[in-house]
Amino acid sequence: GRPLIVNTPEKDPRFYKGVDERTEFKTRDIICVPVKVKDRVIGVLEAINKKHREKFDREDLSLFVSLADQVAIALDNARLYEELEEMFFQTAESLADAIEKRDPYTGGHTQRVTSYSLAIAHHLQLKSSEKRCLKIAAVLHDVGKIGVEDQILRKPEPLSPEEYNTIKRHTSMGAEILEHIRQLRDIIPGVKYHHEQMNGRGYPDGLKGEEMPVIAKIVAVADTYDAMTTDRPYRKALSKKVAMEEL
């Protein structure tokens, strides 16, 4: 692709007249510049009908070429950012999966909690940035279990009070792990407080009502719902209806 000025489009065989005929719009002149990334055309900048019935000239073309270069850089940077974000999310999923494999009773738990959390976020009409933050928080909500012994995670019987206290520490441990990563600090409330309860009987800080961050409330509901509707060694899964009523 190369930059192009067409000041008599009606005489150019490449010009499609159908649009003008249907819209009753008169195309007098056109300037087109390819948007390239590493010699690959990824788009086109186009303008038609310069103001005051003037014709496009070489100065206009030079300006458009410069603008196309800036657009190409912006689009390529956006692509690279999306790829980096996706790679990070996949890494987080792999970490969560590795932790999950230590506990034979929670297969697929992280994936379901993430799905439920995003469904709640959609219902609440959260912003895209809030959904991205929530998605990562849901994936990493149990990352602190990396510091819990296998014999406790895999225990089929009800936990002793001491073992339960050990399990409860996974929320704070998860927050401590993530606070060293500056880009993840916004998700820490969802990880640290996803076992808090509206009545203040949760852990680790006994938050109550509006003290709980929204991100933590959403992950808490998703996490609890999944725990209630899946089989555990000490009880059978509840029906979706019963779980919803209890929640």
Feature annotation, model-predicted:
Residues 4-29, 49-54, 197-208:
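Signal-transducing coupling segments at domain and membrane junctions
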Residues 65-72:
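Allosteric cytosolic regulatory segments
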Residues 28-37:
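A short, aliphatic-rich beta-strand micro-motif
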Residues 38, 44-55, 156:
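Short beta-strand-to-loop transition segments that serve as allosteric relay/switch motifs
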Residues 59, 75-89:
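Short alpha-helical interdomain "coupling" segment at the junction between an upstream regulatory sensor module
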Residues 7, 24, 58, 89-247:
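Metal-dependent catalytic cores of enzymes that make or break cyclic nucleotides
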Residues 52-54, 81, 102-106:
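Short strand->helix junction
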